[in-house]
Amino acid sequence: MTLGNPTKSWHSKSTLTRVGIVLLILFAVPFAFTQKHAAAAQTIAPAAQVIQNLVLVGTSTIQATPLGSGVAQVPEIAADSFGDSSVKGAGVAQAPASPTSIRGHNLPIPSKEAARHSLAANAAVTANAAFPPPEPVVSSDSVVSFQSSGFRGFNGISHVDSRTANNGNQFSIEPPDQGLCAGNGYVMEAVNDAVRVFDTQGNPLTGVQDINSFFHFPAAIVRGTPNQFGPSLSDPKCYFDPQVRRWFVSELMVDSGTNAGATGRSFNLLAVSQTDHPTGAFTIFMYDVTDDGQNGTPNHAGCPCFGDQPLLGTDNFGVFQSTNEYGATSFNGAQIYAISKTQIAAAAASASAPLPVVVHIDASLQLLPFGGLSYSIQPATSPTGGGGVSEPESGVEYFLSALQFIDTFDNRIAVWAVTNTRSLSRNSPSLRLSFAVISSETYGQPNPAVQKAGEFPLGTSLSDTEEFLNTNDDRMNQVVFAGGVLYGGVNSLLKVGGAEQQGIAWFGVKPSFDDRLEGRVVRQGYVAVAGANVFFPSIGVNNTGNGVIAFSMSGTEYFPSAAYVEMVNGNSRPFVHIAAAGQDPEDGFSGYKQFAGATDGIARWGDYSAAVADGERIWFASEYIPKACPSVSSTTTPPCRTVNANWGTSVSAVHP
């Protein structure tokens, strides 16, 4: 369903230069919200820019490796990089007990956890309060049995594929974290912790390669006496840029565990193809995000830190990433990184080309007058490879972020811009960071999602009940800039059909510049299904606003499935199509209390889906639960699970 809404906004603009660490002061102009107010003429604490070095790691290709058996081994689940703990109770699913814990990535935003805990307390007073706004009451979309025009779909990488890659020198991991990119006749998928390339018919063009090997690092683990550990990689993203015709794959790397040669530092990784073919060579780069004042990083409070869930976007001139920065006991908000797109593409293709610099912008404090530290500032990608150029701004990359901090619901989002991105190719880049807070439809902290009852052998063996699915929070998901509009969506608690369900709030924001950044919600709406839950949206549209919102769906009548709604002229249609119907309940280790670090009864899911236009089709992928895993080397279809997990991914395409 689609809604319209004029918006009000609050603005700020800052100029960043290259000289050392440049402090910038942002001034809040008067603005009266219909909810929480920002005091007039505030001075926000200084933010900073630092110029960092990009480091060449090596070259790599996506290639087949021998497969392991997938039999549970010790250790089976990666020890948390931020503190080990022991298995409780039954141990690792029929394997001997060993020190294990759930991997620490895609961490919760502290203020959102407070909101989750206060949900019940706030519910009674919300209806009569001006802010937070009340829970949205929305109509239900219809689940239909037919597909959109030109639909095609196939199974992507599964847990079995990931666990057995590289001769089984992998851990069991939940959730997959969906990376997907398409272009030039290819489709690439990257998940935790494997990567593969397909043609547009779904035929595999490469084997499944483990992510560590692809990024030119030692295997996650080689079990033996003693065990040999590699660095921990997670949170994949990928993008084919039609402007420079190169493939970009990003990952977070934490190198502070027990691996041999560990540096005790954290990095963002970028793999850039040397040609427009993802089956060919990639060049691997990295830069430090530890932010402890060492190795050219700024000195942030509570660090050494790591940059959780690196997000990926581009405009005409730059490649942009943003992270949520965490220390051992601290949350430092959002950090933005910018690199010259043409220079990194040239450096990938030629060893003699100079390496570009990395411009690091601390964007954590800008939203303090509105409730808290900024988080998950999603950079936009574009069907054309450029975020748009406005000559006075000399290049601009746009971002969106959510604003729900400490209350259950909110009706504001933020639009951001980094301008003068043309300067990224110069010796002294000079960027300007701007943002505007605008009013929007209401959204708020989701609850875990129920799934259809079925067989769950792992949980049954542990005498546990069937799991719920973790919908995480209402941070902004993937953003695309198409036809002059920024599209993005969030998970949200909604009231539909008289009951609370987990749904999706989506936004279409038109940004503009007239001395300052302006933003206006020109389209928005909800995706909701009575008696079911939809979550982890990604919007893929072309420049006419035609495409899909992709997501996962579950409910008392639905096993976890991959689903979508169509977008037509920038508006969502009220029909939910099931791209791949789930065949069993989620039955993975991450929701069973016997595994250290697990959330009792709530399994990790997502943490995000992906959708992208390739010029002809809209490609999208989401997590779901398949019954069997078709084998490339055999005519049999074995069960799509190991002892510890059973997730799969579905890759689909439609003609917009």
What would you call each of these model-derived segments?
Residues 1-16:
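N-terminal secretory signal peptides that target proteins for export/translocation
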Residues 19-32:
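Bacterial N-terminal signal peptides
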Residues 40-656:
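C-terminal PAP-associated
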Residues 31-43:
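C-terminal region of N-terminal signal peptides and the immediate post-cleavage residues
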Residues 15, 33-34, 100, 113:
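Intrinsically disordered, low-complexity regions enriched in serine, threonine, proline
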Residues 12, 17, 39-40, 139:
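Short amphipathic alpha-helical "recognition" segments used for binding
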